[in-house]
Amino acid sequence: MKIALYGYGKMGKAIEAVAVARGHEVVLRVTGANAGTAPTGADVAIEFSTPDQALANMDLCLDHDVPVVVGTTGWYDKMNGVRKKVGDKKGSLLWASNFSIGVNLFFRVNRMLAGLMDTRPDYAAHIDEIHHIHKLDAPSGTAITLARDIDLKTKGYSGFELKEDNAADQTISR
């Protein structure tokens, strides 16, 4: 498979290493220096850039009929527009706040526990998230997914609040 990588930081380089080891070919590596480069010749694009660049990269891939896998978070407030474009273009887009199998199992357990918490109004959910200082998006898509799932599964909650303590420590609580 021929892959276009949008975002060539730590994650992009890790994806490239695994892809090449499995016999795939990386035909494009997009960084800030060559932003806006079309995914010509790619079978699929993998998007792990920054929230401000992700939407432009998704648009570019959809405009060139290249399916795109998106791991970048921080753009979900524009989800309706992205869904519309995918539908209008009859394109393909797969996104997740976290692609780790372990974290997705954790998401499932979180939803189960949120359902159990619904019977315990004397308890409240609270999420503290701490990352390394190089984390580009905070709070992470993972923390937002956890909070959203608790909100959806538990009566009595009507959303969640983001509290920023500092750049490396983000709190999501209710």
Residue ranges of each PLM-predicted region?
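Beta-loop-alpha module in the N-terminal Rossmann-like domain of NAD(P)-dependent dehydrogenases
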Residues: T37-C61, G74-M79
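Rossmann-fold NAD(P)-binding glycine/threonine-rich loop
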Residues: D59, D63, T72-W95, I101-G115
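Short, ordered loop/turn segments at secondary-structure junctions
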Residues: G32, T73-W75, N98-F99, I130-H132
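Active-site-proximal catalytic alpha-helix in oxidoreductases
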Residues: I101-M117, K135-R148
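Hydrophobic beta-strand scaffold residues
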Residues: V26, V68-V69, S92-L93
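C-terminal substrate-binding/catalytic lobe of Rossmann-fold NAD(P)-dependent oxidoreductases
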Residues: K2, K10-P39, P121-R174
